[in-house]
Amino acid sequence: MTDNKLMVLPDVQSSADRRNIPIRRVGVKGIRTPILVKSQSGAQHTVADVEMYVSLPADKKGTHMSRFWTLLGGINKPFAPQMMVEVMQEMLASLKSDGGYIRLAFPFFMEKSAPVSHLQSTMDYDVVLTAECADGKITVTQEVIAPVTSLCPCSKEISKYGAHN
């Protein structure tokens, strides 16, 4: 702007789309962000991989992509699975959509004791929280992937002598 004239940029995403084609999901994927997750001992810092989408009506050209980031930055308390409904409602209201999808995937760490020696160690569990809104109904799912170790009878027997923790 070299000549002191006020320039008005067009708001393309809010303009009408004459093609009249609805899009089921528009949004962001592959976001890695630090989050604070509620735990039995208070809260735990971790890093989440995030996907966030909204449905786009046939008469719209786009959505405000920066609002996804703003919504993530607005989570300022320890996150719990129950909050997925609240985050979904905020996203739909902010982006003026009637359908959406949110996915958070993160590692969660817990202290565990060895069965014989009772030594403490940290185990990581992969957690995936999803929320989906379709036909006015919000569905939340939680998936936890827990490592499993089996112990053969021979190993169990020699663990009494300190062979395994």
Over which residues does each language-model region extend?
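N-terminal intrinsically disordered, cationic/polar leader segments
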Residues: 2-165
